[in-house]
Amino acid sequence: QRPVAGGRGKDAVIVSATNDVNFDGSYRYSFETSDGQRASQEGALKQVSAPGPDGDTLGEAVRGDFSYTDDAGNQFAIQYTADENGYVPQGAHLPTPPPIPEAIQKALAYIASQPQARS
């Protein structure tokens, strides 16, 4: 367990921080607090395949991570991406869907192998 200098939660202080914003729209930031919270993120503008509601074809591609320790001493860490596919977090403590049963996998493979019906 890390020693806590500056307290936990609302008493925590920022012990390191970076923030870089570039003219091309890319950026990077990170910080760490005295109670062990950490976060970092970087992003850049990206050409997207479909225009948004305002007709813009530029979007952001972001990736980052954050971690913290709860009051019980459990450590949590999340890595994520966010882009035209949405927010996609990953972490050992996050629930995952159950595996697809074999019979359903076979049925889906069969359906995919069939020619498309024309209307």
From Swiss-Prot:
Glycans are attached at residue 96. PROSITE patterns: CHIT_BIND_RR_2. Component of the abdominal endocuticle. It comes from Schistocerca gregaria. Residues 24-98 form the Chitin-binding type R&R domain. InterPro entries: Cuticle_Struct_Prot (IPR050468), Insect_cuticle (IPR000618). GO terms for molecular function: structural constituent of chitin-based larval cuticle. Keywords: Cuticle, Glycoprotein, Pyrrolidone carboxylic acid. One of its GO terms (cellular component) is chitin-based extracellular matrix. The modification Pyrrolidone carboxylic acid is found at residue 1. Residues 33-55 are annotated as: Disordered. This is Endocuticle structural glycoprotein SgAbd-3. It comes from the Eukaryota.
